[in-house]
């Protein structure tokens, strides 16, 4: 069960940038907390951060065939990037969008997320704890998908066995 965590522009500045909005926690600590959860729950987690839209698109595309799910904070690109939205849609992987702040309670231009339209869910406004919530949700989603695939494979095997006996 592999999850790729993709962090967008300026998130490398957490702990320094606008602490009244984003708090004092650095991105490295958020990632360490996520890794701890992953280790405790049999998950593999990979982290990626970029300030460049094209690099984020490339990373999303690289997830196809390599990851089971994506947790993404597109940051400011949430509101503007059709390219990131289309990349998420193209890979068809369970994707959860995270925002540290409640984007719906901020400036008007931040209230609509293009990328949320293709995400399985959005977690916003819980500070760094939102990433932990995303890990819990992704674990549940991937566990359910795994159980479904297992049940389908079992049903298919039983159907083939039944066809052989006929």
From Swiss-Prot:
Q: Which PROSITE patterns match?
A: DEHYDROQUINASE_II (PS01029)
InterPro entries registered for this protein in UniProt: DHquinase_II (IPR001874), DHquinase_II_CS (IPR018509), DHquinase_II_sf (IPR036441)
Residues the entry annotates as binding substrate: 73, 79, 86, 100-101, 110
This protein's species is: Wolinella succinogenes (strain ATCC 29543 / DSM 1740 / CCUG 13145 / JCM 31913 / LMG 7466 / NCTC 11488 / FDC 602W)
Q: How does it assemble?
A: Homododecamer.
Name of the protein described by the UniProt record: 3-dehydroquinate dehydratase
Key words of the record: Amino-acid biosynthesis, Aromatic amino acid biosynthesis, Lyase
Site keyed Transition state stabilizer: positions: 17
Q: Which family does it belong to?
A: Belongs to the type-II 3-dehydroquinase family.
Reactions listed under catalytic activity: 3-dehydroquinate = 3-dehydroshikimate + H2O
Q: What is its EC number?
A: 4.2.1.10
Active-site residues? Answer: 22 (proton acceptor), 99 (proton donor)
Residues forming coiled coils: none
Give me the gene this protein comes from: aroQ
Q: What class of enzyme is it?
A: lyase
- Gene Ontology molecular function terms on file: 3-dehydroquinate dehydratase activity
